[in-house]
Amino acid sequence: MTAPNVNTLWAETLVGELVAGGVDAVCLSPGSRSTPLTVAFAEHPDIEVFSHLDERSAAFFALGRARRTGEPTPLVCTSGTAAANYHPAVIEANQSGVPLLLLTADRPPELIDSGANQTVDQEKLYGDAVRWYRDMPEPEAEPRKVRMLRTTAARALAESTGSDPGPVHLNCRFRKPLEPTPMPEDDPAGVPADWAGGDNGAKIGRDGPFVTTSEGVETPDEQTVRRVQDALEAAERGLIVAGPADQGLSADSLERLAAATGFPVLADPLSDLRFGPHVDRLDVPVCGGYDGYLGSDSVDQWDDPDVVVRFGASPTSKPLRHYLRDADCQQFLVDPAGGWSEAEFTATNLLVANPDATADALAGETLGGVAASWREQFIRAEQTHWDAVTETASETYWEGGVLSDVTALAPDPATLFISNSMPIRDMDRFGGPRDADLTVLGNRGASGIDGITSTALGAGSATSDPLVLVTGDLAYYHDMNGLLALGRCAVDATVVLLNNDGGGIFHMLPIEDHPTFEDQFRTPHGLDFEPTEALYSLQFERVADRRQFRERFAESVQTDGTQVIEVRFDAGDSHAVRDQLTEQVAETLAGD
């Protein structure tokens, strides 16, 4: 059957090609100019539709799905400021290498800069934050243009998910009629009667995607592998550092490399390597407490590592980053995108290659001679740190104690999304390694507190695992409208709300002693979040102590629906506990 008009033809062709390329869901926001795309997606039988009233929340929701799946969920919005609301999520996706596909509807070109309603300059709206941009021509039932459209869809998916994944922006212009209104074939908006309906006039007998893209795995050459192997074999004090990476080094490849070298593993909670069966299987320690001891004076007495193999982005932990900065050794950074994720500028070698292929190649013939005393040093430091955390949690409760309990009590499997600011830092320091299938996610590309709830719910929509969101009060407030997705997108979550009434992280900075600190940095708000229970049809409960939290959390992760568990803290008190733990661990290590 011939499409009723050229806009419908164009949109259905684009959507059909995206589906052929593997797309199975979309995030739609209401608007008129995007009607052709909205109808085409909504009526496609193989598309799951997530409807969002707010484009900013929609973009972070799509970001969360992509973090969990590694594949883009297209976003569709109308013209004007709607597209600008995608920008914060685009920045995060760009800087953390997460695939996004943005389909922004636009007006015909003659209306740009004319004063026409809801018309802004959308060309290259996101600047250099996208991997590829295309200003699409106006729809036309012409075979060459439709072949271009199909090829563009294939390229958009390939650019978004390639070796350097990230956002792609297609700016889609439409004239009226925007609805699937039948138009005469001799009308500019009409479709010729002889247009081949099934093939849309340009499929030329192909099955599946119009263009099938294949990407090879970048493996380091033999000379490079041998050079790195020589360094690893000569090392007595080697380390493997796994930084944040949604789709990074696999646990299997890590096991092979760690077993071959004997190097301790320092695993960021966002590396996907701090948790899993390998934690107990490996003979070398998988370390998660380094943030609590690497900055201590006692560690200054340790010998430097003589080689470090690094995967993923720059670590969350500042003490670890500074430890690597001050280490006088070779540091091999494996980065498949060649993105130079190296904020301390200490890497001596950049390997632009696939992490698994690199680790497997290095493990193939490497036989490490790492000193047993080097491993024991980290084992002892880890034990000291976790003993101190356990002892402190039994006597007092602080924000980090909540993260420790969440990590220990989360079901296996589970998806955990951790907010920026203090929650991710406390997760890094107090989330102990565990033999459990925990997928821990966070927005550490630009590290903003915007869109946290929406990103978490997007991740939850892509898995059947229980979802746990740990967020602070400012992040909860900042993205409160994201809670609407709980009902509209059928996502359940356990939300752990750490409420210290403002910006607790600023207690870690020298500005704490300045007269402007309270009003301009800590910014206490005094908000009561309990009314979100009625507004968003969730369950809200405030707990008073550790026993209540552990009981309520254990119940929530086994219960349908969404429960918000609020725990209130004094930010200054929590900061004091962190300092006390640092001193306790340092004193114990110094006395060993």
Curated annotation (Swiss-Prot):
It comes from Haloarcula marismortui (strain ATCC 43049 / DSM 3752 / JCM 8966 / VKM B-1809) (Halobacterium marismortui). It catalyses: isochorismate + 2-oxoglutarate + H(+) = 5-enolpyruvoyl-6-hydroxy-2-succinyl-cyclohex-3-ene-1-carboxylate + CO2. The lineage of its organism: Archaea, Methanobacteriati, Methanobacteriota, Stenosarchaea group, Halobacteria. This is 2-succinyl-5-enolpyruvyl-6-hydroxy-3-cyclohexene-1-carboxylate synthase. Pathway: Quinol/quinone metabolism; 1,4-dihydroxy-2-naphthoate biosynthesis; 1,4-dihydroxy-2-naphthoate from chorismate: step 2/7; Quinol/quinone metabolism; menaquinone biosynthesis. Catalyzes the thiamine diphosphate-dependent decarboxylation of 2-oxoglutarate and the subsequent addition of the resulting succinic semialdehyde-thiamine pyrophosphate anion to isochorismate to yield 2-succinyl-5-enolpyruvyl-6-hydroxy-3-cyclohexene-1-carboxylate (SEPHCHC). CDD domains: TPP_PYR_MenD, TPP_SHCHC_synthase. Keywords: Magnesium, Manganese, Menaquinone biosynthesis, Metal-binding, Thiamine pyrophosphate, Transferase. Its cofactor is Mg(2+); Mn(2+); thiamine diphosphate. GO terms for biological process: menaquinone biosynthetic process; organic acid metabolic process; sulfur compound biosynthetic process. It comes from the Archaea. SUPFAM superfamilies: DHS-like NAD/FAD-binding domain (SSF52467), Thiamin diphosphate-binding fold (THDP-binding) (SSF52518). Homodimer.
